[in-house]
């Protein structure tokens, strides 16, 4: 089967990526084990439930699954759930770790029938490793080279049927041949405040922390639609409630704790405000190219595109246009500025008013 406290606050408390191995272990403890326990992503859950039921009925390996979407939405959790629901073992790795064809071959040849191989950041597979993967996905076979130079020969090895679950935050970087070999492709979306409140309530129970519904909803509203962030904020608010109160997480206690953490009522932290203020003040509201924006705020281009922008765009504070990034009317209002005359209204907030 699947092999698999209080922490110092990470530098960016609303980062959607794990801050440390300790935090990853903490996440595993809170992770739902079965599909029925998984909150949100109703469409994806419904599809996987049917596909897994059919595969179990036929006693076959589940078709290969590609999960994509912003970080922290539950791709790794779903991979573990798939293995558990199918009653098989899970082997986990990531694209950057598989540097040589032999690394992948060693994993594949050790899989038992119908096992799940989970490759995180699959878009970062090297081309030479990806080539080895194609026949493994299609025919459950791999070709490996024995020997060197003129004496080298190719040997075909048969594999047990298996399921590859690939996860990526950048589906557009997958090559077409690799993408086409996944029979099940699912996009994970940001969660609603109500869904996140259910996750926060469940996590609080596992942590044996007292929380009322309004306290859970206040944390959920500021979690940027992301369960990983919601659970991290819950732990920090729990710490605050134990020191400053009687340990019960109320709306007022959550509001005070999150204000201390510099997380505002729409889930923005210092980095979000820094990006939007750069667009507004340094570039006159845009358009501004992502490379110029990265230089202005001292961040990597990938950080802006993968971590900061998705939520700002989803919330209607930033637009991505062919000419560059542009601040919306909602961004001007958020900072108490008058928007330029003739600017279209914002798209509204994902989670409503706090």
Swiss-Prot record:
Listed EC numbers: 3.6.4.-
Stretches the record annotates as Head domain (RuvB-H): 265-354
Enzyme class, UniProt record, top EC level: hydrolase
Listed InterPro entries: AAA+_ATPase, AAA_lid_4, DNA_helicase_Holl-junc_RuvB, P-loop_NTPase, RuvB-like_N, RuvB_C, WH-like_DNA-bd_sf, WH_DNA-bd_sf
Annotated binding of Mg(2+), by residue: 76
UniProt catalytic activity: ATP + H2O = ADP + phosphate + H(+)
Key words, A-Z: ATP-binding, Cytoplasm, DNA damage, DNA recombination, DNA repair, DNA-binding, Hydrolase, Nucleotide-binding
Domain of life: Bacteria
MF-aspect GO terms: ATP binding; ATP hydrolysis activity; four-way junction DNA binding; four-way junction helicase activity
Binding site for DNA: 301, 320, 325
Positions of the UniProt region annotated as Large ATPase domain (RuvB-L): 4-191
CDD domains: AAA
Residues annotated as binding ATP: 30-31, 72, 75-77, 138-140, 181, 191, 228
Region of interest (Small ATPAse domain (RuvB-S)), ranges: 192-262
GO biological process: DNA recombination; DNA repair
Family stated for the protein in its record: Belongs to the RuvB family.
HAMAP family to which the protein is assigned, alphabetical: DNA_HJ_migration_RuvB
Free-text note on domains in this protein's UniProt record: Has 3 domains, the large (RuvB-L) and small ATPase (RuvB-S) domains and the C-terminal head (RuvB-H) domain. The head domain binds DNA, while the ATPase domains jointly bind ATP, ADP or are empty depending on the state of the subunit in the translocation cycle. During a single DNA translocation step the structure of each domain remains the same, but their relative positions change.
Function field: The RuvA-RuvB-RuvC complex processes Holliday junction (HJ) DNA during genetic recombination and DNA repair, while the RuvA-RuvB complex plays an important role in the rescue of blocked DNA replication forks via replication fork reversal (RFR). RuvA specifically binds to HJ cruciform DNA, conferring on it an open structure. The RuvB hexamer acts as an ATP-dependent pump, pulling dsDNA into and through the RuvAB complex. RuvB forms 2 homohexamers on either side of HJ DNA bound by 1 or 2 RuvA tetramers; 4 subunits per hexamer contact DNA at a time.
Oligomer status and interactors: Homohexamer. Forms an RuvA(8)-RuvB(12)-Holliday junction (HJ) complex. HJ DNA is sandwiched between 2 RuvA tetramers; dsDNA enters through RuvA and exits via RuvB. An RuvB hexamer assembles on each DNA strand where it exits the tetramer. Each RuvB hexamer is contacted by two RuvA subunits (via domain III) on 2 adjacent RuvB subunits; this complex drives branch migration. In the full resolvosome a probable DNA-RuvA(4)-RuvB(12)-RuvC(2) complex forms which resolves the HJ.
Descriptive protein name: Holliday junction branch migration complex subunit RuvB
Record organism: Cupriavidus taiwanensis (strain DSM 17343 / BCRC 17206 / CCUG 44338 / CIP 107171 / LMG 19424 / R1)
